[in-house]
């Protein structure tokens, strides 16, 4: 019998060769292809016996063919039922997956907001560094949205006492007057 825990993988049309399809189907239910081969063998033997003129042996192989066809159909139905049961079991396990509680969802949202704040801070610092490197004067370009998010998360960001670094303009930086 096939492994009942294995569920067939569905391939889009045109992506699977006939050899790959045969291998996949053989792994899912090996009794069906074996039954087909046995049925074809019995039919071939009955044709050989008919050519030899042995009608009793031909009838024996024709009856064997009918029996083997019946066994192949039984294997086909049993394999289909096993695959259906495995698919239902996999769907049931997926439905019973642990769900996140409200507290876990809030914690994940808080972590995401904190990460976004750190990202905005890093982008701000990077923009200042790039502007200084390019010679432009950048002054406290922090957006109101970033300040609002920092207040919502509870992170205190001191934008007032942040040192301003004027870009070099050819004069000395310490002479502001």
Swiss-Prot record:
InterPro entries: Hypoxia_induced_domain (IPR007667), RCF1 (IPR050355)
Record's function text: Cytochrome c oxidase subunit which plays a role in assembly of respiratory supercomplexes.
Principal location class: mitochondrion
Residue stretches making up the HIG1 domain: 3-94
Alphabetized UniProt keyword annotations: Coiled coil, Membrane, Mitochondrion, Transmembrane, Transmembrane helix
Region called Disordered, residue ranges: 150-177
Gene3D superfamilies: 6.10.140.1320
Topology in the lipid bilayer: Multi-pass membrane protein
GO biological process, alphabetically ordered: mitochondrial respirasome assembly
Subunit structure: Associates with the respiratory chain complex III/complex IV supercomplex.
Pfam families hit by this protein: HIG_1_N (PF04588)
Stretches assigned to coiled coil: 83-129
Transmembrane segments: 31-48, 61-83
Subcellular locations according to the entry: Mitochondrion membrane
Protein name: Respiratory supercomplex factor 1, mitochondrial
GO annotations of cellular component type: mitochondrial membrane
Family: Belongs to the RCF1 family.
